[in-house]
Amino acid sequence: MARAFPLERVRNIGIAAHIDAGKTTCTERILFYSGVVHKMGEVHDGAAVTDWMAQERERGITITAAAISTTWNDHRINIIDTPGHVDFTIEVERSMRVLDGVIAVFCAVGGVQPQSETVWRQADRYSVPRMVFVNKMDRTGADFLKVHGQIKNRLKANAIPIQLPIGAEGDLSGIIDLVKNKAFIYKDDLGKEIEETEIPDHMKEIAAEWRSKLMECVAETDEELIEVFLETEELSEAQLASGIREGVLNHGLVPLLCGSAFKNKGVQLLLDAVVDYLPAPVDVPPIQGLLPNGKEAVRPSDDNAPFSALAFKVMSDPYGKLTFVRMYSGVLEKGSYVLNSTKNEKERISRLIILKADDREEVDALRAGDLGAVLGLKNTTTGDTLCTTDDPIVLETLYIPEPVISVAVEPKTKGDMEKLSKALLSLAEEDPTFRVSTDPETSQTVIAGMGELHLEILVDRMLREFKVEANIGAPQVSYRETIRASSKGEGKFARQTGGKGQYGHVVIEMEPGEPGSGFEFVNKIVGGIVPKEYIKPAESGMRETCESGVIAGYPLIDVKVTMVDGSYHDVDSSEMAFKIAGSMAFKDGVKKCNPVLLEPMMKVEVEIPEDFLGAIIGDLSSRRGQVEGQSIDDGLSKVQSKVPLAEMFGYATQLRSMTQGRGIFSMEFSHYEEVPRNVAEAIISKNQGNS
C-alpha cells in the first residue's frame, strides 16, 4: 500500500499548556474544523473527544496524552493533547519525546503559569520547535501583548506576534494576519464564515508597527533576508513566511498567534500556521541511537531505511494491550516479527491501529513519521525501541522522573488481593512514574507516584476498570540518604560452625559522588588479594544496602565507593560471604562519612487575592518554606516558594479555608535538600522504632 501523504506533508504536533489554558478545547475545535468530528465537544460538559477516560470527563482535566490523526490543506496532522496538571508530567514528557513540533497554549488572562514553565523546559530538553497560541481572548482581562512580554521575560523565548486580535474580551471580532497584512473578520458563531478584508483603519498604525518588528525579527534569523531588509526595509509575504519557518525549525523564533477556541475564533488560522511553520519529520534531525557494538548511529525519516520505532505509551484496552509507537524509519507491517532491542526479545505485530480518540482505524502498515498503536505486544514497555532483527539499534529513551510520594494500599476484602495485584501491575505497565513495591518490614503493598492527585486518580481507576476497592494509608514522603564526608569502611564476615566455614573481608574508600550519580563502584584491587569472582558479589552487597539505606531505611544516593583491599580464605570464602562483607563495609563506611537525610523540595506557586498575602506568606514560612519571589497584578498576588513536600499534605484544603475558596496553587518537584537536624532525628527514631 502506497503512502497516503508524502513525509513533507506530515506534521506530528503536541498541544501543551498549563491546566485550564484551554488546550483540550483547542484540540476539539481543530477536529471539528478539519472534519474528524461533526459536533463540538466541550470539556466542561464532559464531551471532549480526547478526554476518553471517565475521570477525565468528570474532572474536566486531561490525564493521558490522547493521540489523534486528522487532515488539513492536504496535510496529515497527528495531534497529541497533553495534560497540564503537574502530577501527570510523564504524559507531557513522553509526548515531547516523540513530537516534531508543539503548540504551547497560554491563557490570555493568566499568562505564563508555573506549569507552562515546566512544559517549556520539557520542550527545551528535546529541542522541539514550537509556536504559541494565546487562547481565551474573549475573557475579561485578556491582554495579548502582556502575555507576549511574559513569554519573552519568564521563558526567555524569542517570541514575536504574527497576528494581532481585533478587539478583546466580549468584542473580539477578528484577527489581523501580519504576514499577509490582512484582517480576518468572523461572521458567524461557529467560526466557519470568515471574511478576508483590509485591516480596519483604527488598527492600521499598530499593525504596521508590529509588522515592522516582525520583519526585523525574521531578518535577524537569516543573512540573506537581513541584506534585503537593510536595503529596502521591507520583506515580501513569501520572504516573511519562509523566514518564520526557518526561524521556527532552527529554534531561533517562536511565533505568537491568538484567538478564542471556545468562541470558535482563530483555530483555522492556527491550523494554517501548523502546516506553514511547524516541521515535517524530514525537517528535524534524524533520531540517534546505539548499535550493538556501542557506536552511535542515526535513522533517517525514510520508508526505505531500516525499520525503527519508539514505544512511548502502553495502555490497557478492552481488546488487549495497546502500545503507542512513533515510527522513525522504515515500514512496520501487520503480521511481521520485530525485535525489542531494549530487552533483546522478539515481538509479533498482530494488529496496527491509527487512533481518532474513541474511534480507531485498522491499517496494514505504519510508515516513517507515523504515530500509531500496536495491539498485542507482550514484553514492550514505555521507552523501549522496536526495530528490524537484521539491523538492530537502541534509540534514545525517555527521561522518567522519580516518584516523590508513596502510600500503603490494601484491598477492602481479603479475597480481592489477587485482583489488586493484577490492577497494580497493569497500571504500572502504563505509567512509568507509578511504582509498586512491598515494604519488607510490614509486608504492605506500597504505591508511589508524582503527587496526591496522581495516586488518587490511579486508585479511582482500580475501582472503575478493575472493580477493586482499596484502603489507602497516609501519604509518605520519599526521603533519600547521602553522605557529606569521606572515610574508609571495613567489613569482615567470618563464621565457623563445624565443617566448611564462611569468610569474606572487604575494605573500601567512600566519598560523596557527583549530584545525580546514584551509586558508583570502582574496583582498585590489584595483585589478586581478592579473587575476581568475589568482586561482583561484594559490589552487589553494597548496592543492595545502598538501595535499602543505612540510617533510616531510605535509598542512599550520590555515593562513590572504591574497593581497595580485603582478604580471602582458600576453603571458606564464598560469593555469599563476600556479599555480606561488602554490605558490612558499606554500612561501616556510611556511619563514618557524616550521613544525612534528604527530603524532596517542591516548587510551590500560590495565587491569591492581595488581602490574603500576609497570611499565606506566614503559613508557608510555618511549613519550613522559603519565599523566593512575589508579584502583584490586577489585585492578585503570586507567591513563589520552595517548601518541603512533607509539609504540603492537605495544603489544598488549608488554602481554601484561609482564602475563602479564592486561592489556587500549583506544586512540582524541584530538588532534594538536607533535612534540618531536629526534623531528621524525629524521622530516624520513628523509622528505627518501626523496624
From Swiss-Prot:
GO MF terms, alphabetically ordered: GTP binding; GTPase activity; translation elongation factor activity
Keywords, comma-separated and alphabetical: Cytoplasm, Elongation factor, GTP-binding, Nucleotide-binding, Protein biosynthesis
Chain ranges of the tr-type G domain: 8-282
Disulfide bonds: none
CDD domains to which the protein is assigned, alphabetical: EF-G (cd01886), EFG_III (cd16262), EFG_mtEFG1_IV (cd01434), EFG_mtEFG_C (cd03713), EFG_mtEFG_II (cd04088)
Gene Ontology BP terms: ribosome disassembly
Region forming the signal peptide: none
Subcellular location: Cytoplasm
GO cellular component: cytoplasm
Gene3D superfamilies named among the record's database cross-references: 3.30.230.10, 3.30.70.240, Elongation Factor G (Translational Gtpase), domain 3, P-loop containing nucleotide triphosphate hydrolases, Translation factors
Organism domain of life: Bacteria
Function: Catalyzes the GTP-dependent ribosomal translocation step during translation elongation. During this step, the ribosome changes from the pre-translocational (PRE) to the post-translocational (POST) state as the newly formed A-site-bound peptidyl-tRNA and P-site-bound deacylated tRNA move to the P and E sites, respectively. Catalyzes the coordinated movement of the two tRNA molecules, the mRNA and conformational changes in the ribosome.
Protein name: Elongation factor G
Designated gene of the protein: fusA
